[in-house]
Amino acid sequence: MNGETLLAETIEMKDEIVENRRAIHRAPEVGAHLPQTVQFVEEKLRLLGYEPRELGGGVVAELTGEDTGRCILLRADMDALKVREKTDLPFRSENGSMHACGHDMHAAMLLGAARLLKAHQSELKGTVKLVFQPDEEGFTGAKAMLKAGVLEAPEPQAAMALHVNSGTPSGLVLCGKGTFMAGCTLFRITVKGVGCHGAMPETGVDPINIAAHIYLALQEITARELPAKTPAIVTMGKFSAGHAPNIIPQEAVIEGTIRTFDRDVTALILRRIGEIADATARAFRGSASVEELASAPPLKNDEALTEQMARCAEMLFGEKSVYRLREGGMGSEDFASYTYELPCAYLLLGAGTAQEDARYGKPMHNESVVFNENILPRGSALLAYGAMQWLEDRQ
């Protein structure tokens, strides 16, 4: 298949891909249950001639050309975040959630790839399995689909995924071989005290005070207990307690994340969080417990497959369209679970910088982040062309 021709076809489809993206963006859903998004994706796939089925909370569809036994999986996530959107986009969300991580872009790009692949079905040297996944953000989606049998009947021998990246020049493809993204573990610390009147704190045990000391003490783990060259981040993004200014509450809750490239380091940090929380709480006459909520392992890109997909991008968009990273980043992604089951390639696609447009370049997960829709055809083309080339080269 000629890459230049395929890219031209994709550019002609731009309006449709953008329309699909905006429809998904306008009605974001969070978590593992995405009924409206699933229905939308299934309807679009049926219109293209696919026979989609629901699996593990997501959607799966296959397309076979020549029956060779070869199969590659293309995956897009489609869940949103509990962020109230503050953009001025005419298709902005108004339901209190937001596609602030670009998963609407991913789903639309895979739908675009589905149309391209269908148009070239007779040229496929095997099967392409399309996977639309829920709850990447909560780290349960990939595991649920794997448990439900997404790697069965037919069994793929490779998998690929794309993720848009705000702050990177539009259309630039970033890739890295080996460990490309950190693993992430979500945790919750529950601090128990004794509620009382705010005027008489001596009659109770203040869980907010205890939790504040725990929060500060946990900063010492990465600063003083790990080697300086060991990448690790402990972030506590949620701290909740109480309902009134004059009442000392019964309980305080901290939720956070641990990010590392090494599962043993994660285990060490989680153990120390438990020890520090327990000791600190007891020092102030309270108690604390720590629980692991969910996790994703470090993402490991297969070197050969990743290089092949990078070369596909260069063939489509030019030699200067790809930047090969020498080391991974501290972001996390539950596509990582696939990377321990079969060879995988996970690439980033630049979605705009502030130098291009003042609206672009804001942080991922920000309430005002805006992604450049002009990159959508590139994403669709790379997914489709990468799959076709992999099937062709496996002969």
Tell what function each PLM region has.
Residues N2, M13-N20, H33-K44, R70, ...:
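General structural feature for long, well-ordered alpha-helical segments within catalytic domains
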Residues N2-A100, D104, A108-L124:
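Acidic/His- and Gly-rich active-site-bordering loop/insert found
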Residues I24, A61, L74, H103, ...:
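Divalent metal-coordination and catalytic microenvironments
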Residues V59, L81-V83, D88-M98, D104-M105, ...:
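Histidine/acidic-residue-rich, glycine-tolerant segments that coordinate divalent metal ions
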Residues L73-R75, F187-I189, Y346-A351:
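Non-cysteine beta-strand/loop elements that form the S-adenosyl-L-methionine
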Residues A114-H120, E152, T339-E341:
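Alpha-helix C-terminal capping segments
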Residues A212-Q395:
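Metal-dependent amide/peptide-bond hydrolase catalytic core
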